[in-house]
């Protein structure tokens, strides 16, 4: 009689204990498989989100270093305009992993042959302000401070589609077309719908804008598009017309540079490079550091807020499910080990008789191992049927809790920041993240790889749960076992 047959006969004779082992092993396998499936689903979702959203790297003036240099030289700290050469920005645009890029330059201006939308405070004080030229406002954006009152905010770009207001859906083209790369070098503009209606302007019309710092500098722009915005603008918009979102014009960056004067020709304020994959940002930065760009003056700021906001909860779920796999595997091995140990202790006499008639110890261990492996195979089969359902329910429940927790934390943090971080700056360099939806569901599906891993873990648990209790008993001499039994 071989040990495999004895294993089958023993399982049949002791159905109660066999069913108990099967139940415990099935529960272990279901939770392990659920954890593995959730990890796989979370990883796939994260990879898809990372590839879809990518990340951005912004080239701009290093204001901190600029201030430190002024302090070291004993100069009074002041804001210095330091534009970036387009030729330098183009060097980074040619590097690997750049999916798209946008150059931006900002300026303030006054309306020429049309009227800007007046803010409430500015309209009330228009008579007094016209008699005084000391209208203190910083309207130059990144181009520098301009101590004059301006009507309009001008943002020069390569493409409006890459501007956060448009990509987030806060603004959209309602007539005509957007600014594109083909418009670089042209004097065209996209204006707000309200501004167009107030001045009876339409696509194809031309407008004139004047520099807020030099009345002799004017730029004539052809309207190629009209957009609508849901943005409420800055809190100071009621005091300064140029902060009113209705008074914001988009032009090619070359047209805005022309408005700022000859010193700004072929320059920009910042460049935003959008990566093909967020994981490639560090590689891009390392490659950028090897170029001839002066990084004592400029700096590269990496931003993957969109990706982190979107996948933050799902990564927490993946981490939790990973811990579940570890804990359940260890706990399962311990519980099964105790059950097997109790079973082996009850079968001491059987083992003593078998060893007394010459049965080898390894065959006895083989019998116990065969019994638990048969249970393991059945348990893994049952887990494969029910694991997918459990994994979906468990994964989405955990994800829902993580999203709720993350939302509460975000609201608490934002409540400690009066004004939400303030105005125009939040959307200046591609750092907007307010309109990004987190991943709120997991498509959990048990894969063949998950089953193979489960099989490996199940067999390992079975071996550990069998060998450890067996060693303590099988080291005894047959005579000792039979004597104690009597």
From Swiss-Prot:
Coiled coil: none
Keyword Plastid tagged: no
Source organism, top-level taxon: Bacteria
Residue ranges, compositional bias (Low complexity): 119-132
Amino acid composition bias (Basic and acidic residues), ranges on this chain: 62-79
Transmembrane domains' residue ranges: 18-38, 324-344, 365-385, 451-471
Disordered: annotated span: 62-82, 117-147
Main location class: membrane
InterPro entries with a match to the protein in the record: ABC3_permease_C, MacB_PCD, Macrolide_Exporter_MacB
GO cellular component, one term: plasma membrane
Pfam family of the protein (one): FtsX
Subcellular locations according to the entry: Cell membrane
Keyword list, A-Z: Cell membrane, Membrane, Transmembrane, Transmembrane helix, Transport
Membrane topology, from the record: Multi-pass membrane protein
GO-annotated molecular function: transmembrane transporter activity
Record bears the keyword Zinc: no
Family note: Belongs to the ABC-4 integral membrane protein family.
Stated name of the protein: Uncharacterized ABC transporter permease YclI
Organism expressing this protein natively: Bacillus subtilis (strain 168)
Gene (name only): yclI
